[in-house]
Amino acid sequence: MALSTDKSSKPYVRYLPFVPNGEVNIPPSKSDVHRAIICAALTRGKCTIAPVALSNDIKATIGVIEDMGCTASIKDGVLTVDGTNIFKTDNVTLDCGESGSALRFFIPVAAAGGINATFVGHGKLPERPIGIFTEALPKAGVKCETEGGLPLKISGRLESGTFEIPGNVSSQFITGLLLALPLVEGDSDIVLTSPIESVGYINMTIHTMAQFGVEIETTDNGWHIKGGQSYIPHDYTTDGDWSQAAFFMVAGALGGKVTVNGVNRNSAQGDRKIAELLAQFGAKVTQTDTSVTVEKAELNAIDIDASQIPDLVPVLTVCAAFAKGTTGIYNAERLRIKECDRLTATAKLINDLGGKVTELPDGLVIEGIDTLKADSVRALMTTEL
């Protein structure tokens, strides 16, 4: 593999044929770090979070808490957050970069703090849907001003109440409300109006909040949130990132033998299901409490319900391209409204390499083949949880 910086084109990566073998130490989960940073800021005290890797999305989250009055510093992978002065600023611009997570987490959090804020973003973020909030928050004391998307101006203070939310929208909306509603006076309920998808990310939120002393009660059709709770300062240890581990695990299934280290078998991350799915494909999977080893074996097609694991769809499609038979991936329509249409982008990438992928409205159908061809492809996707 080589990285080119030819001035006549954008940087690109050149891959040469090889059989992947070896061990990989997985970096911390970006999804986990996002949530921990916000919880730490809301303690109004001093916390550490470790290990932390500074991706652009995490930098955006740190920037937002700083603009809301917190201080943050990082050294040797340990992030220190001091939330003493959170919400003591007003009329602030909160730049969420290209992070949908930061945007949808912080809108209700800022509203719970009663600050006047203008949310801005870059790339495709200004076009990402926020209608769930612009419809629900004005009913709960928050004025929202937007011409559709960003910039979004909010003012007023979030009030308790009942929030009816479709279950098939991004779980980021629900996470934002879960983080914010314990801060307001009075109890609240989030009521699902349709079956929940990506529940793993919501469970991760609830798990992280519990580490900081905040309780969420799961009900038959949503969640009950007690008001007037306080986030308690806590030194937080992050999980390894199952989403990133998935790519190396699939490489093992297709190539030789790959071990990923630093992944928690009992993690709240829904993407830990990758180990189970690769075993269903036929790969040899061996798991301990903190590692997974995947070895090549004959792969056979399976059907995959992606409603709870949409971010695994691209890498699962790669695996399916080499599995005998026809694999179907369903219930992933939300991938069409990410930073790009991930279903179309994934299908195009595999087909450009000689694969056979057909798009469905909510997924992909992949016919397995023996090998893909060498070619140039354009990367359109970023991961964002």
Where are these regions (language model features)?
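Structural preference for solvent-exposed beta-strand-turn elements
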Residues: 2-385
